[in-house]
């Protein structure tokens, strides 16, 4: 339902950008409320923080359509919502976090957003390591 909510606010979104949006939603939520929203764990991969097993995650949702597109001679997968999010699943505090991240990230390109995530100590300290990024690193976020 979080994916549908984000796609409802942002429209068609590439996987690369969605990975970072989910990271920022969960880590900002943890910093502000002590709880993440999605229940996902994140790893610091070469191109930024991503949900663990993200490559399998998006295909598990019937309401999310994936389309392969060629962008600057590179294959990218875009995500499209085929349904509506049930907004009653989210508390007002959760919606405030989701809204803040989507509002800030919506106008950014996937590439710019990826570069921004590379400024985060949470990514820098864990890139290339097999462990997940600890949620305590939410307190070191610099871009939100």
Region annotations inferred by a language model:
Residues 1-144:
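Domain-edge interaction signal
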């Amino acid at each position: 339902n979080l994916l549908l909510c984000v796609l409802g606010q942002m429209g068609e979104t590439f996987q690369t950008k969605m990975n970072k949006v989910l990271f920022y939603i969960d880590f900002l939520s943890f910093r502000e409320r002590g709880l993440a929203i999605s229940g996902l764990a994140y790893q610091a991969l070469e191109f930024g923080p991503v949900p663990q097993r993200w490559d399998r995650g998006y295909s598990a949702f019937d309401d999310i359509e994936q389309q392969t597109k060629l962008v600057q001679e590179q294959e990218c997968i875009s995500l499209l919502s085929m349904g509506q999010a049930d907004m009653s699943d989210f508390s007002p505090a959760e919606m405030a976090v989701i809204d803040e991240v989507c509002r800030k990230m919506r106008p950014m390109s996937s590439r710019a957003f990826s570069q921004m995530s590379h400024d985060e100590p949470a990514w820098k300290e864990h890139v290339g390591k097999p462990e997940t990024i600890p949620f305590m690193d939410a307190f070191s976020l610099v871009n939100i």
